[in-house]
Every structure is written in structure tokens, then in C-alpha cells.
């Protein structure tokens, strides 16, 4: 019995659109960005193609339709990822990280959070909304490199701690993150929203006592660096 892997007409159409975008819009910019020694400037050069990808529904298409997303399937998403990766894997990562940052809200957020955060992501009139995923950390004390299975004296995996300021009714995050995705935003002042994995129970290690915090762009006391 054979399996037919031929894409149906609608996905073939999507593939052609994604391929045309990658070849005609993305590739010329990638050639210039690859020559830029400053990594942040090279990242900023991707903003133009990103805005076009947003208009095509590639940046937020995986989000639920009821909150303004495209509600596309995993196969649709991978078609777009494959075509953009063929030209520049880094750009495909920018798109996919939006999912890492926003899908936890779609899965676990309250109705209010979904409408607030996902609604903002899918209705940006400037077509440049960026979500960040902030997990890994530099090794050291505190720190953990996001290795949840490491056994040591300090809590393993995540060293950034979030403490509740009861007076203000908000959490204060302390620590450093390393290799976060999209988190600096287009201008190193922060993505529109970052999902930051933190430890809310410092006495517990491994996978226990962890929480995901939604952090707005450029919160007080937060410094982003491309180095």
C-alpha cells in the first residue's frame, strides 16, 4: 500500500506563495544582512520582510481564529517554515518563536489574557508585533542553562526568580537570561511581549516551582544586549 504525499490544492497554493515571498522579498535582504557584522543591525534588517510576512499571515497564522489568528494547521505552518528556511533559517526562527511566546497564552491563559495579548499580536496595524521566548540562562550562580534534569546544590534549570510584591500586586523578576529568542525586539528595548520562564518557588528544583510570566516591552530595570 502506497502513501500519497502530494499536497492538496490549497496547500500547494500556500507553498507557492511562501516560496515566492522567500525568493522575491526575503532573499535580497538576507544577502545584505549576511554582510553586516553587527548582529543586532542584521536582525533589524529583517524587519521589512517580517512586515510582509505578517501581512501574508505567516507571522500569526498559527494563532486561534477567534482571537484574530489564521488558525492554520501544523502542516500549513511547516510549509511556510520549510520555504523560508530554504532561504534563511534565522528568519524562519523569528516567525516560529512567535508561537513559543504566544501559544502558551492560547493554551493556558485566561479568556481576558487571550483577548488582550493574542488580540494585540494579531491586530498590529504596523505589522511588526514580535513575541519573545525567554528561557535559557548563563551558567553560574545563580543560573542553570535551562537543564531541568541537572542535579546540584542549587535549584536546577532556572535560576531567575520571581517574587511577588504584595504592596504593588505584581511580580519582580531577578536574574539573567541568555540566548533568548526575539526578546530584545527590533530595537533592543524588548519585544512587544516576552514569555519568561522563572522560578516562583526558589526552594524547589528541576521542573517544580516554575511559572511563565508575561512581560511587557522595556520593563523598568531590564537591559537587553546583543552580545
Annotate each PLM feature:
Residues 1-95, 115-116, 120-123:
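Amphipathic, small/basic residue-rich leader segments at the start of a protein or domain
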Residues 18-28, 112-116, 171-174, 212-222:
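Long, well-ordered alpha-helical segments
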Residues 56-58, 89-90, 100, 125-130, ...:
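Short coil/turn connectors at secondary-structure junctions
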Residues 73, 106-109, 143-153, 183-187, ...:
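Short acidic, glycine/serine/threonine-rich loops at helix termini
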Residues 92-114, 141-144:
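N-terminal glycine-rich flavin-associated loop
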Residues 105-122, 126-135:
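A generic, well-ordered mixed alpha/beta core segment in the N-terminal half of proteins
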Residues 129-164:
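A gly/ser-rich beta-alpha-beta helix-loop segment of oxidoreductase catalytic cores
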Residues 169-223:
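A short core secondary-structure module
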